[in-house]
Amino acid sequence: MQTSHLFTALQQRQQQRDNRYLKGLVVILLLSLLISLCAGDIWLWPTQWFSETGRLFVWQLRLPRALAVLMVGASLAVSGAVMQALFENPLAEPGLLGVANGAGVALVMAVLLGHGLLPIWFLSACAIAGALLMTMLLLGFARRRLLTNARLLLVGVALGIVCSAIMTWAVYFSTSLDLRQLMYWMMGGFSGIDWRHQGLVLALLPIVLWLCCQGHVLNFMSLGEQQAQQLGVSLHLWRNLLVLAIGLLVGVSVALAGVISFIGLVIPHILRLTGLTDQRRLLAGCALAGGGILLLADIVARIALFSAELPIGVVTATLGAPLFIWLLTRVKSVK
């Protein structure tokens, strides 16, 4: 009985601590959103939001962009956490394993073949198809045990490099102005986002919410195939559903903002280091932290240069690459 009471007390303490972390992430997200609406070449404080200038810059330009950044950040972070559980690899994430680049290749080829005349929904469908194809290919390697986790990571990186090379060659040899402008898109950016793109942004919301509610399934899957099946989890069904959800999130995110790396890798690890290890709370934390961190990166991209804007993919890569190196050394030391 004493052991049972002790376990219950420890569990309640862990839940209280996790809830405090999640509340803190909500505060960070709201502050990031507030700063994002204020920041720019012209800083507009909340008291100026309803002026004539504020109605243009805040409500017509900055708000739709901030909502898109928030949802893309949440989508990439949640996708990274789910991929790490699916592949049983702590270094898995959409950008590193080539999933985002697969979506990018499909989108670039659609623009090339369509001469820049295809509607945004068709380009999004192509990006989703590319992301799904790459994810299923990698998952097939992982589940057939054809490759170790380390080799699977290298295969994903190699596929990502090949996809990047294809996109670069396509842009270089193109005479289409639309395709040449995709060079900026390939580095990631939200500069062209407005209210016309909010349909894609809203499409991300139900998928992110659904994934955040599947933490118990990922907890069961982490126990191993045999134990998960004994608990009534259909592994084949859930793997396909999760792969489909990841492909949708990554495909729409790439269609909106281009290829943005390291958000899906770094955010889950940072949250695990703070103690959020239960997938039921980790996924919600990833959604909040991913949105907040990408909002902060977008603010840096907008204000770092006067009258110019850095590609947000460059900002996340600059900040995320040192953390990725540290994670690699940490995984090696643990082994």
From Swiss-Prot:
Bilayer topology term: Multi-pass membrane protein
Any one GO CC term of the record: plasma membrane
Listed transmembrane segments: 25-45, 67-87, 95-114, 118-140, 153-173, 200-220, 243-263, 286-306, 308-328
Pfam families for the chain: FecCD (PF01032)
Record has Transmembrane as a keyword: yes
Primary location class: membrane
One Gene Ontology biological process: cobalamin transport
Keyword Cell inner membrane assigned: yes
Subcellular location: Cell inner membrane
Alphabetical keyword list: Cell inner membrane, Cell membrane, Membrane, Transmembrane, Transmembrane helix, Transport
Superkingdom of source: Bacteria
A GO MF term: vitamin transmembrane transporter activity
Annotated family: Belongs to the binding-protein-dependent transport system permease family. FecCD subfamily.
Subunit structure: The complex is composed of two ATP-binding proteins (BtuD), two transmembrane proteins (BtuC) and a solute-binding protein (BtuF).
PANTHER family listed in its UniProt record: FERRIC ENTEROBACTIN TRANSPORT SYSTEM PERMEASE PROTEIN (PTHR30472), VITAMIN B12 IMPORT SYSTEM PERMEASE PROTEIN BTUC (PTHR30472:SF29)
NCBIfam families: PRK03784.1
Reported function: Part of the ABC transporter complex BtuCDF involved in vitamin B12 import. Involved in the translocation of the substrate across the membrane.
Entry protein name: Vitamin B12 import system permease protein BtuC
Species assigned in the record: Yersinia enterocolitica serotype O:8 / biotype 1B (strain NCTC 13174 / 8081)
